Amino acid sequence: MMDMKVAKKKLGIKERYAHMTRGLGWEPTYQPADAVFPYDKYEGIKIHDWDKWVDPFRLTMDAYWKYQGEKDRKLYAVIEAFAQNNGHLNITDARYLSAIKLFWQGVSPLENYVVQGFARAGRHFRGEASRVACQMQAVDELRHYQTQAHSISNYNKYYNGFHSQRHMWDRVWYLSVPKSFGEDALTSGPFEFLIAISFSFEYVLTNLLFVPFMSGAAYNGDMSTVTFGFSAQSDESRHMTLGIEAIKFLLEQDPANVPIVQRWVDKWFWRGARLLSLVGMMMDYMLPKRVMSWKEAWEIYAEENGGALFRDLARYGIRPPKGWADACEAKEHISHQVWLLFYEYGGAAAFHTWSPTDDELDWLSTKYPNTFDKYYRPRIEFLREKHARGERVYQTTLPTLCTTCQIPLAFTEPGDPTKISHRETVYKDEKYVFCSDHCQEIFAHEPEKFVQSWLPVNQIYQGNCFNPGVDPTAPDFDPLKAVLEYFRFNLGRDNGEFDGSEDQRNFAAWRGQASKN
C-alpha cells in the first residue's frame, strides 16, 4: 500500500488563482501595515475587505506569459514580413503617415506613463489580487509601447517626422496635451489613478481610440499598425473588464466612497474627451480612406456604450459625468476645430497638413449635415483658395493654452459654435485661462497642482525654449526658427504643407518604381 501512487489532484482555476495571488502575500511583522502602505488612505477611500477584489479573468502570471508569448510570435512574424516586402508602399497615400506620426509622437509615450502609474499603484495597494492586476497591466502597457516602437520604426527608415520622439515629447507644444494628461494621472493618488486610467480612459473612452483608428489603418493598407493594434486590443478588453470591476469594488466597499469616485469620474471623463479631440481630427481629416466619422464613433462608443454603463452604475449612486452633455454636443465640432488649428499652425508641427479635396469635403458634409457646410466648409475653402494663389496660411503667433488640458483656445461655446470659449480664474493674484467650465472646475479643486503646469507657450515667451548658446538679442534672431530647432524639427522636411513635401515626392517615386518597369 505504501508504494501506491496517489493521483495528484489538479487545481481548478479558482484555487489556482487564489494560490497565485492571495497566496503570495504576507502580514508585515516588524513594521505596521500603515507604514508599509502609506498612500491608500489619504484620498479618503475606505476599503474594508481587500479580498473582495476579483480579477474576472482569474489570470495568473504563468498563464499571462504564455498568452503574451504566443501573441508576440504572430505579431513579429507580420512585422518582419511587412518590412521585407516594402509594406510601407502599400498604404493608400503618404498623407496617412501624418496620422501615424501623431500617434507615435503623442500616444505611444503615454503608454510609458501608464506603466509607471500601475507599477506605483500596485506598490501602494494592500490587497494581493489588486497588486497582481496592476503588475500585469504595467507589463501590458510596456509591451504596447515596445510593439508600437518596433512596428512604426520601419516608417522611420523612409519618412520624416518619426525621429526624436523622446526629445519632442518633453518640449513640443501640442504634445503637452497628452503629456499633461499622463502627468496629472501619474501624480494623483493610487485610487484616483485607477479611476483615471482603468475606468475613465480604458473602460469609457479607449474604444474611441483603438477600434476606429486600427480599422482605419486596415482600410488604408497599414497591416503593421493593424497587427500591433489587434495584439493590444485583447489586452484592452481585459483592461476594460478590470476597469469596471475596479470601480464597482470601490463603490461597494463603503457609501462614503461614492462622492469621491464621482468627482474623479467627472474630472477624468472630461480630460479624456478633450485629449481624444486629436483622434477625432485623425479620423475625419488624416485618413485618406475613412471608416467612419468622429461623430459616428462617438455615438457608438461613447453615447450608446457609455450611456448603458452609467445607467448600470446608477444603482451605486453614480450619475453620468458633468461634462457629458457638452462632450456629446462637441462631437459635431471638435475634429474640424482641431484640424483648422493644426492647418494654420502646420509650420510648427512635426507632421504635414493639407487642404481637403472636394470629395473629402463632400464626405464631411454628408457626415455632419447640421454643422459642416454652415460653419467649417466656407473657412476651409477660403484657406484652400489662398493656398492655390500661393498664399498658404501659417500662423506665426502663439496661441493661448488652457491651463488644465493645455489645448489652445480653439473650442467654441456650448450652443454657440461662432464664439470661442474662454474662462478665467484669478488665484493668488495670477490669472489662469481655460477652454471650458469643466477645465476651470478641475483647476478650482486642485489649484496648487495646476499652477505648476509647464505650458509650452508661456515657456517660449519666457525664453526657456531656445538651444544653449542662442542669443535672442542678436539682430538676425528668428524666434520661431529658434524654437523649432529647440524642438529638433528638420525644418522644411518634418513640418509644413504636404503638397510638394519630401514625403509626398519620395512615396510617389518609390511606389512608381515598385509598380512598373
Regions found by a protein language model. Give the residues of each.
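Long, hydrophobic, well-ordered secondary-structure blocks that form the structural core
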Residues: L102-P178
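Intrinsically disordered, low-complexity terminal tails and linkers in eukaryotic proteins, enriched
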Residues: D358-E430, E448-N517
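Alpha-helical bundle segments that constitute or directly flank the non-heme di-iron/ferroxidase center
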Residues: P28, D93-F125, S188-Y219, A273, ...
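Extended, helix-rich structural scaffolds rather than catalytic motifs
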Residues: M1-H48, K52-W53, N257-E391
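Acidic/His metal-coordination segments adjacent to aromatic residues that form catalytic metal sites
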Residues: F82-F103, S164-S200, A218-N220, W268-K289
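Conserved alpha-helical segments that form or flank metal/cofactor-binding pockets of metalloenzymes
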Residues: Y30-A81, L142-Q165, I244-A246
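Inter-helical turn/loop segments and adjacent helix faces that build the functional surface
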Residues: R120-V132, N154-Y159, T187-G189, V211-S231, ...
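Cys/His-rich microdomains that often coordinate metals
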Residues: L409, C439, F443
